[in-house]
Amino acid sequence: MKIAILQFGGTNCDQDVLHVLKDVVGVDAETVWYKQEDLTGFDGVVVPGGFSYGDYLRAGAIAARTPIMNSVKKLAAEGKPVLGICNGFQILTEARVLEGALTTNEYPKFRCHWTNLRVETVDTPFTSKFRKGEVIRMPIAHMEGQFYAEEKTLAELDENEQVVFRYVDENGKVTDEANPNGSLENIAGIVNTSRNIFGLMPHPERASESILGSDDGLRVFESMVDYITENF
């Protein structure tokens, strides 16, 4: 098993993800510079956070149009898992492999703090180690994290159980106060209809060891690895 961690100009969370996969989970992982393009031999992809290309045009817009993303789409078409974290989520929406868009936070400032999330579905390659309805903690760090989608798309996401995480209070209740960026329906992360592409704004790699304040995020990577082990 080998997992690719993409690097674009401005990516800055790649080494954190590499550490979690190699040193905490214990699987083979490798950073892949965007010019490499070919992802043959990899069983999964992580598109990590950062500020790819300085967030020029829109966050993720330039990275989404690099040739390596064609290889990501090809890998996903084979059923292999693709995880997009923060800027990675933005890139995946810009690449049109996930629904919706991430726009400037409702209160336009950079938000960097812990959030409570409610697990909405465990029927994905990334959440099999969670319990539906449990409240977990992960930090956010973004300026453009407000999830937006048209009403019809939101209804489809809910109907198909594609919403994976929502921002909630410590008791698991969806409230405006618990929503850090104005995301519609407090959405923090979604999957595609095939369920093997997952994007989220919170950072699971920053919550993968108890010394950091939470290890809830570790289960995202462990679930992904279990899925690869069982299917590829």
Swiss-Prot record:
Cellular compartments annotated: Cytoplasm
Pfam families from the UniProt entry: GATase_5 (PF13507)
GO BP of this protein: 'de novo' IMP biosynthetic process
Coiled-coil boundaries: none
Active-site residues annotated for this sequence: 86 (nucleophile), 203, 205
Sequence ranges assigned to domain Glutamine amidotransferase type-1 in this UniProt record: 2-232
PROSITE patterns: GATASE_TYPE_1
Keyword annotations of the record: ATP-binding, Cytoplasm, Glutamine amidotransferase, Hydrolase, Ligase, Nucleotide-binding, Purine biosynthesis
This protein's pathway: Purine metabolism; IMP biosynthesis via de novo pathway; 5-amino-1-(5-phospho-D-ribosyl)imidazole from N(2)-formyl-N(1)-(5-phospho-D-ribosyl)glycinamide: step 1/2
EC number of the protein: 6.3.5.3, 3.5.1.2
Reaction equation(s) it catalyzes: N(2)-formyl-N(1)-(5-phospho-beta-D-ribosyl)glycinamide + L-glutamine + ATP + H2O = 2-formamido-N(1)-(5-O-phospho-beta-D-ribosyl)acetamidine + L-glutamate + ADP + phosphate + H(+); L-glutamine + H2O = L-glutamate + NH4(+)
A GO cellular component entry from the record: cytoplasm
GO MF, one example: glutaminase activity
CDD domains: GATase1_FGAR_AT
Record's subunit section: Part of the FGAM synthase complex composed of 1 PurL, 1 PurQ and 2 PurS subunits.
Purpose of the protein: Part of the phosphoribosylformylglycinamidine synthase complex involved in the purines biosynthetic pathway. Catalyzes the ATP-dependent conversion of formylglycinamide ribonucleotide (FGAR) and glutamine to yield formylglycinamidine ribonucleotide (FGAM) and glutamate. The FGAM synthase complex is composed of three subunits. PurQ produces an ammonia molecule by converting glutamine to glutamate. PurL transfers the ammonia molecule to FGAR to form FGAM in an ATP-dependent manner.
NCBIfam families: FGAM_synth_I, PRK03619.1
Name of the protein: Phosphoribosylformylglycinamidine synthase subunit PurQ
Species in which this protein is naturally found: Methanosarcina barkeri (strain Fusaro / DSM 804)
Phylogenetic lineage: Archaea, Methanobacteriati, Methanobacteriota, Stenosarchaea group, Methanomicrobia
Gene: purQ
